[in-house]
């Protein structure tokens, strides 16, 4: 399936 990348910055 598709790859998902998520990035969170505080």
Curated annotation (Swiss-Prot):
The lineage of its organism: Eukaryota, Metazoa, Chordata, Craniata, Vertebrata. GO terms for molecular function: G protein-coupled receptor activity. GO terms for cellular component: plasma membrane. It is a multi-pass membrane protein. The keyword Cytoplasm does not apply. It is found in: Cell membrane. Belongs to the G-protein coupled receptor 1 family. Its main location: membrane. This is Putative G-protein coupled receptor. The keyword Manganese does not apply. Keywords: Cell membrane, G-protein coupled receptor, Membrane, Receptor, Transducer, Transmembrane.
């Amino acid at each position: 399936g598709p790859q998902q990348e998520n990035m969170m910055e505080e």
